Amino acid sequence: MTNIRKTHPLLKIVNHSLIDLPAPSNISAWWNFGSLLGLCLIIQILTGLFLAMHYTSDTTTAFSSVTHICRDVNHGWLIRYLHANGASMFFICLYMHVGRGIYYGSYTYLETWNIGILLLFTVMATAFMGYVLPWGQMSFWGATVITNLLSAIPYIGTSLVEWIWGGFSVDKATLTRFFAFHFILPFIIAALVMVHLLFLHETGSNNPSGIPSNSDKIPFHPYYTIKDALGFLMLITLLLLLALFAPDLLGDPDNYSPANPLNTPPHIKPEWYFLFAYAILRSIPNKLGGVLALVMSILVLAIIPLLHTSKQRSMMFRPLSQTLFWILVADLMTLTWIGAQPVEHPFTTIGQVASVLYFALILILMPLAGLIENKILKW
């Protein structure tokens, strides 16, 4: 008799995705981040659900309700810190996952890649709206600054901002709708993840060499289920270490002061995972130019497949491209550091140089490196 997992309509889907899936025999730990992102999403949805049971999305009580969660709810402090630091883990895994895609040429799977970019945008929007909910100083001013960027859009800008705010400033209506969106978006993300996987399973996974591996496949279970389980263990350990020993390490002390529209914090800055984009935004003196650069800093990922000039898919055997890739990583770290600094000399200049380098690397230098490597190999 055929095994039920191969015949049952529902189990068959699980079987083809997680058990009998033919996987390349040589995929490294860099291929673990997809499943880790799935785990992060589950953790965030579960902790978020329990937080939503005690949270109130009203300007007068939002801050107190978060305090109440931490002080009075059983293990509320743990749920809150798992959720806050879970977001950081989510973005660490996201950036590693995208970096892996760039390094090993996984972006040649166009549908999978483009859904991935859409997922990145959606996760960023969700995280931004979640940061507004505790209604601390940085929540309020972060929401004010970022939503205000839309006013740079010609003609409709101001009306658009007021429509999003639901009034003439960030207020009760804004907080309520941000809570609604923050609750619904993770489920939209989960649906997009299914589409992401659907397209991935049309082609099968890439591998470090970038060479088709159809002649050498192994079943996903037990080989990669056990490998993923090890990744899960490491991620959960790291998250627990963060949440239990240094819960506020990555947060902003300003967010422990209730939102006050009459008092602007000296340095308005987002959470660490948005700092690179924030630095690019600030490096351009013009408002509309800055907003366009901010959007392009992520949207540039969609252009990468069009700029693939090398005859090889992966960077595994391309030392010149590898060097540029790691310069790009260092550049992003520099931008992250600059985004947290005040707008003064020499930080402004460093930010401008790093921003120009970021776009130059992706749009000019890396495609050029591919052509040079082809030339060296006489291809």
From Swiss-Prot:
Superkingdom, taxonomy of origin: Eukaryota
One GO-annotated biological process of the protein: mitochondrial electron transport, ubiquinol to cytochrome c
Compartment(s) of residence: Mitochondrion inner membrane
Keywords on record: Electron transport, Heme, Iron, Membrane, Metal-binding, Mitochondrion, Mitochondrion inner membrane, Respiratory chain, Transmembrane, Transmembrane helix, Transport, Ubiquinone
Keyword Secreted (UniProt): no
InterPro entries: Cyt_b/b6_C, Cyt_b/b6_C_sf, Cyt_b/b6_N, Cytb/b6-like_sf, Cytochrome_b, Cytochrome_b_C_euk/bac, Cytochrome_b_N_euk/bac, Di-haem_cyt_TM
Residue intervals passing through the bilayer: 33-53, 77-98, 113-133, 178-198, 226-246, 288-308, 320-340, 347-367
Chain residues that bind heme b b562: H83, H182
Membrane topology summary: Multi-pass membrane protein
Binding site for heme b b566: H97, H196
GO molecular function, one term: ubiquinol-cytochrome-c reductase activity
Cofactor note: Binds 2 heme b groups non-covalently.
Pfam family, one: Cytochrome_B
Cofactor(s) essential for the protein: heme b
GO CC terms of this entry: mitochondrial inner membrane; respiratory chain complex III
UniProt-annotated binding residues for a ubiquinone: H201
SUBUNIT field: The cytochrome bc1 complex contains 11 subunits: 3 respiratory subunits (MT-CYB, CYC1 and UQCRFS1), 2 core proteins (UQCRC1 and UQCRC2) and 6 low-molecular weight proteins (UQCRH/QCR6, UQCRB/QCR7, UQCRQ/QCR8, UQCR10/QCR9, UQCR11/QCR10 and a cleavage product of UQCRFS1). This cytochrome bc1 complex then forms a dimer.
Miscellaneous comment as given in the Swiss-Prot or TrEMBL entry: Heme 1 (or BL or b562) is low-potential and absorbs at about 562 nm, and heme 2 (or BH or b566) is high-potential and absorbs at about 566 nm.
Family: Belongs to the cytochrome b family.
Function (record text): Component of the ubiquinol-cytochrome c reductase complex (complex III or cytochrome b-c1 complex) that is part of the mitochondrial respiratory chain. The b-c1 complex mediates electron transfer from ubiquinol to cytochrome c. Contributes to the generation of a proton gradient across the mitochondrial membrane that is then used for ATP synthesis.
The name this protein goes by in its record: Cytochrome b
This protein's encoding gene: MT-CYB
